[in-house]
Curated annotation (Swiss-Prot):
Keywords of the record: Nucleotide-binding
Protein name: Nucleotide-binding protein Csal_2524
UniProt similarity note: Belongs to the YajQ family.
Purpose of the protein: Nucleotide-binding protein.
Species of the source: Chromohalobacter salexigens (strain ATCC BAA-138 / DSM 3043 / CIP 106854 / NCIMB 13768 / 1H11)
GO cellular component: cytosol
The keyword Protein transport is annotated on this UniProt entry: no
Gene Ontology molecular function: nucleotide binding
Length: 161
């Protein structure tokens, strides 16, 4: 039976490249001349540091653009509130990887409500979808792409016939 997996992942190496490119861009931008600002990537957390709050917003836009250019969906970013202390401001951005249990249940529920002839199973941090025909699986993908919402960055992997 044909099947595929629904996951929410990103390439960590591409994320590292995006952070490096963002650092290079803010070092050469005119509006960041003479300003101490940087991005640091530790695990799945990117820390933005600048002198004032509005620079963090500009840096966040730069980071978002670089992630998109490197093929990482911007919806995987969990943006924390900026923290200002004295002459420094910093903000953390967590790059989310893997589907949580409520998100998996929501995907399974949407597939069942659509009355497609597919079965969905939760397997850890991914959802396996099986069906008798490849066309049914393509309908399931189209359904999830149309109403996945702005909060989920979904990828479809491990196609089997």
């Amino acid at each position: 039976m044909p099947s595929f997996d629904i996951v929410s992942e990103f390439d960590k190496h591409e994320a590292s490249n995006a952070v490096d490119q963002a650092n290079r861009e803010i070092q050469t931008r005119f509006d960041f001349r003479g300003v101490t600002a940087s991005f640091t990537l530790e695990g799945e957390t990117v820390t933005l540091e600048a002198e004032v709050d509005f620079q963090l917003k500009q840096m966040l836009d730069v980071l978002r653009n670089k992630l998109i250019a490197r093929g990482i969906d911007a919806r995987c970013m969990d943006i924390k509130e900026p923290v200002t202390s004295g002459v420094r401001a910093h903000q953390e951005v967590v790059l989310k990887q893997g589907l949580e249990q409520p998100e998996c249940k929501d995907i399974v529920k949407r597939l069942k409500e659509a009355k497609l002839k597919v079965q969905a199973q939760i397997q850890g941090d991914k959802v396996r979808v099986t069906g008798k025909k490849r066309d049914e699986l393509q309908q399931a993908i189209a359904l999830l792409k149309s109403d996945a919402g702005p909060e989920l960055a979904l990828q479809y992997t491990n196609f089997r016939d």
